[in-house]
Amino acid sequence: MAENEAPDFLTMPSQNGEDTQPQVGMIAQYVKDFSFENPNAPAVYNWQNQPQIDVQFNIGTQQIADELHEAALRIEITAAAPEGVAFKLELLYGGLFALRNVPADALQPFLLGEAPRLLFPFARRVVADAVRDGGFPPLLLEPIDFTQLYMQQAEAQQVGAAGTAGSA
């Protein structure tokens, strides 16, 4: 050990036994809001044209308490054919996450990238079951890389902010 280096036990983050390592845990997951509309039943089951499926999603976050955050995944699906709307589905699927000792710069990447990734398989199942229960073949949503989407959005915001600052 070099003379300038402190022993490992002196550089530990806590001397009183308090755990200062980042900890993340999912406390609960739940359907916050759900709607399935089949406005043209029973005629829709005789339509000759396959509906076009439009899927939109959004992620929202909210701090509930000091170390408690909610991430919510909103999925909106419209299936439309030339004859009309086959079905419309709206799902708001949330998760409650305990985040302790997580650095401020890691909160948004977790809440907008990792948390939706954890919630998505369960929301996907709700969607597939609801569409099937509505009398249609189950709709299996393709996996979404939420972390990559978050990084792209953050990069676009930085470029936009730099462009705005450069033109001011």
Task: Go through each PLM region and give its residues.
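N-terminal intrinsically disordered, cationic/polar leader segments
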Residues: 2-118, 122-168
